[in-house]
Amino acid sequence: MRNYLLKDSAIIIYPNGKFTVCDKKELEAVSQKQPSNRANFEINISGSSRLTLGEDQIVYKGLNETEDGLELNYEYNKEHLQITTELKLIGETNVIVQKNKIKNIGDSTVKLTRFSSAFFEDIAYSEDMPWYKNQDIRVSICHSKWQGEGQWKKYTLPELGIYPTTIHDSERESFKINSVGSWSTANFYPLVIVEDNKKKNTWFMETEGSHNWYIKLASYGGYAVPSLSLEACGCDDANGGWYYDLKPNEEYSSERAFFGMTSGKFEDAVADLLVFKRADSTVRFNDGIMPIVFNDYMDCIWGIQDPKLILPLVDKAAEVGCEVFCIDGGWCENEGGKSGLGDWVPKAKFYDMDGLKEIADYIKSKNMVPGIWTELEACNSSAYGYRMNEDSVLKRYDTPIGGWRGFYNFSNPEVREYLTGKVEALYNIGFRFIKNDYNASIGIGATNNYDGESPAEGAIVNANTFYDFVDSLYEKFPELVIENCGSGALRCDNKMLRRCSLQSTSDQEFYYNNPSIVMGSMAVMPPEKAGIWSYPYPAMYPYADGKYVPFSPDDEYYDRMKDGKETVFNMVTAMTGYLYLSGRIEYCDEKNFALVKEAVDFYKNIRKYISVSRPIYPLGMLGINEEKTAALGLISDDRLLLAVWNITGKEETVTVPLSDYLKSESKINAVYPSNAECGINASSVTVKLGAKEATYIEINL
């Protein structure tokens, strides 16, 4: 038996090759526990049941200590398979990163129908009380939908259908969150957090990959040997139809999973994962200074990329202090022989490529970086790239996926070369920021040239080749910044997020719904990557009955905006992450424009703290349709940034309990807006807010 210590927890490797994770304080007790024969990965072979540890099945062959973790080796002699489990132990955290590899060392092809990323048991284990008698276990799940991302809910085990009913040692009680398709976070974020509030310990499991996945919470052993487990899997025939024909001498790798146990609560698990995700990210801004973006789409010009509309916005964005100006959708041709999606040719009625360069030059003349919207994976049937060759778009059973609105096949070298050329053309005329969108899912997968493998495996192959393509863009264009947008945050799993500088948190159009989305999003992505729309002076979606209605604010509109409350609320929300400004700010009156500029200046002083902070939730999470007060804190070693919202119809004095974080010498350093009414003592912050008002407070700890 071998033990390895992490920050609060320990990993125990039993003689049969089984490993588990426990509180360091309970290491001795858990070490004495008889381990089950369930391996820390799941393998199914066509025509067989789940394989387990044992002499006639999976045999443990020992471990090797590596530079940053462990390598455990197994064999399944009946099918001549070697399995390697790589465990990376993330320093100063409780995070364990697991990846499994399986190799066929025999002479015959083996058809795999499940190959999971991670599995571990003994959650909430106690010598004195089985898990099903512990009434203090809570399971947190992050629900998601378009314009409603980041919706965390807490459940009891019985509410999820997990309760023992038998003495038999089989998994019959389980709950699963899953995704099928390339919108990997459209329904759930792939993370489950289990809190044992009795012992103050928390377990977590997360996986990654822009394709099919599931995370399963299950019980084994019934009443006799009760065990609670978590499993993460991206390869399963029962979840999207995955299978893989593993040929002789071939090796296959699972996706990574991140799991562990921390002493503490939900926020502590999030903090551990945040440390890992920051270290795992391949792109970060120097010194954590995120350049402020103005994007002309949301509640702004909505894709009507007429220079007569763009240029006044450029002027005002520069005046207010923005550092990037991004031209969003609508700049490219979508009529006649060219396609808006796939060919990336400027819309002739507005400008040609030289005209686009003139706009980029104008943006640069205002000391801002030019940015532009793309959807590099998509192509209309009229696009040249769609018919470049017979394999340029993704197909399923020889039929293009998505019909007229197809998807490029990134396994095709010609596609990668063609799109690299399109990015290069934009780069050469000055664009250094790309907002890359993704507005449809490929479903269960694709069957292009994948040697007869399942569509689900095709989805994995295409996702990985697209990741490689993104990495190649950074190598070729070193000044390039890429934003990931998947109809908001419908594709924001870590494998995509780690290679992008920022992530759109939502396409939400109503400012008062954003705090809920933002608070939940902070638990799944680094705050400095969480791109948050702020749209003071919003122009709502301009198409009524299919007809375009130009924005024309009337007296009623100006009267609604004159007190500045909506502007402040917008800016407070966006300043909790990556400030992403929009709205028709060229119409701002003097008061509102000053409030926008005050916020931008405030943000420039505090953004360096955001990039080293972790989120706290002193008033809990906020549901998207809840009308109550809410608070989000971002805490670092010597600083607490606190946003407080009143999403009710009446004035409130909000008391935010912070006794775990404040000291007697803690003091308020700055507030936004500057006339906000707030106070501080050693245990709380108090803020007076009218209906639909918000305040941002910087506190020196």
Give the positions of each predicted feature.
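Active-site-proximal substrate-binding groove within the catalytic cores of carbohydrate-active enzymes
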Residues: 4, 466-678, 686, 691-696
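Terminal connector regions
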Residues: 260-291
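Aromatic-lined carbohydrate-binding/catalytic grooves of carbohydrate-active enzymes
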Residues: 289-420, 433, 441-445, 451
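Buried hydrophobic-core signal for structured, non-transmembrane domains
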Residues: 99-102, 249, 255-257, 642-644
